Amino acid sequence: MKILGIAVVAGAMMFTAGPALAAPIHGNASITCANGAIASGAYRNITVTGACSVSAGAVISVSGNITVTRGAVLDAQSAASTITVRGNVTALSSALLGLGCQPASYVGNSGHACTVDPLDHSTIAVNGNVTALNTGTVLLNGITVRGNITALGGGSEIPWSIKNNTIGRNVSVAGQTTNWLGVLFNDIGGNATLLHIAVTDTDPGAHGAFVVQNRIRRNLVCLGVTPTVTGGLFPGEPLNTVGGRALGQCAALA
């Protein structure tokens, strides 16, 4: 079941070790990562143009923004790290954005284990928004976002996971054609909206998009999701907690 085994994706995305990017001597410089691991340091902005990861145990602070350009990869979900972004994180067309990993024992559910050390966990906070625009893959696991998570378009054969996050405002996911998508165990301060999403996995246990045990302060809205939306694997499981209304295909999931 993908809801229990999303973390296996992390193993497939480990890169051949490249040279680590040295932290700026005086800090607060903007850098571009074309390959390899981003090391501990204080940066103004980080732009990812190739296949980049973060060093295990890295402590990274970004006073501005992180941008993952078209077709690039930011893997901050295979090795545990501490990342603080004062601005926004944006991933563009066909990119892969992976932020956060933690064991099941840390979160109390299936988790998303780090590949480098399955018992370790990330601490990642974004003060602004996380935005994915026609992005190939989005993996957000156990991070804090003070603004919005917005994913418009995109998709791939890699399952998408928005899981165990704390989001200050809204989660909006729309227009994907992707193998699998789960919005799971999140604390959402505003609305959660899923619109016009096609899930292509033919596994009989896939059940379309999963919207499972989220705490949503305002409304939960699901429209045009195919083949369906499900609130869990088994009858009688706890549903989503919604402070406003549950509407559309998610009307019965709260």
Predicted regions and their residues:
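N-terminal segments that cap or nucleate solenoid repeat domains
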Residues: 23-71
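Small-residue (G/S/T/A) turn/hinge positions that recur once per unit in extracellular repeat modules
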Residues: 37, 50-53, 58-60, 72-73, ...
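Feature marks extracellular polysaccharide-active and adherence modules
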Residues: 49, 55-57, 63, 69, ...
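Acidic/polar low-complexity surface segments
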Residues: 79, 91-122, 150-151, 155-161, ...
